[in-house]
Amino acid sequence: YFVEEIIKLEKPDALLPTMGGQTALNVSMELRPDPVEIERAAKFLLESNSPLMEVGFEISQCNAIPSVVELAELLAIPVAQHSRSFHCDFPNYHPLHIGYLLNLPSYMQFYPHDIDCCISIGTRATQGMETFMKNRRIPLIHASVDPEKIGRNAPTAVGLLGDIDLIAKDLVEAIKSMASPAQLKRRTAERRLKISTYSAGKHAGTREAGRLSKGDPLPWQKLLYELDELMDPDAVVVEELGRGERTVSHINFSPEGRLKIGRTTGMALGWGVGASVGTKLALPDRQVVSLQGDGGFMFGQSDSLWSMSRYDVPVLTIILNNRSYEATRFRIMGAGAAGEANRDYVSFLGDPDMDFAKLASVYNIPGEVVSNSDQVRPAIQRGFRTLKDGRPYMIDARTASWGTGAGLTQYQKFSVADLRSRKV
């Protein structure tokens, strides 16, 4: 049917740009939430003395960040980023942003009022608000575009199904209809000041820690600090690190500024370098940085370097090479007999040690190994100059392991050669 309609046009070629952007095939999915449920949710939020908002990836998918920011600002709600999100779903240097849910204990020490209402907006995956809500008898408002996720992992007081942008806008209008600007100001003034003071101190402390970090191996905090200092204001960061809060804590993201892509909501590995090529293809006039862990890069990603080199894809690839799978190490060392015995036979990635700069050189991509804090800023600057010349660049950043079991180098010794009965 669609092809027949194109043939009927006098100038079918005029539709081709629209087809390329899929506008001609776009079906509106903007489902408006139930107004009765909106009113119930608005009352819960308005009556709360210490609310909390958790934000997830559906906010970015629905282009709803400005509306969600307006909602949070209206009631001075502290905002925590869901740990499994593809983007940064709320400006992470905003005065109301307190980090991830794991930062909540430090926030509550600063503002010692028990959370009495939660709104989880645009979230689907586990390991979020449902963990926080365990054993708490407080109202939970869950807003999502997916009806199968609402109330699935935690009982909800209000379920809001619909487009996230419309949900946020309707909540704002409902709250404004229930309270005057003066009333809202009186209810939120103290909390707004407390949250902004906490957030400012947290960001200042994080940046200062990054600035002052030094040594060999390279502290990852220093790397991210210098990257934040040197990147373009509208750069795109495609990140595939074990812990996304590193990136969100140290690099400034916002709808009008830098864009964060990754990690996937399923926490998959092996996609980031190829995704950075696609990102540069889609956004050729924006600086693109691919942030990788050594473990993730070893999930078969070197072939993307071939594409970068052949087609002159100017992407700066930075591999945080600490010779370890940190995610598995944290889990193993955090619980169980192996952790109690200080043994981890899974996570160590040395022997042989990987040299990713040499690997890049096989594809005619320039690069370097950075192991000391004094080397990192000049290396990033060289990388960005190479990007301006139209070529990719590789930085193999030899970063320090940290946390429990950081110094472990155990692995199970095994040799296929020793299995042979004859030397063939």
Model-assigned labels for residue ranges:
Residues 103, 112-114, 151-153, 159-161, ...:
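Thiamine diphosphate
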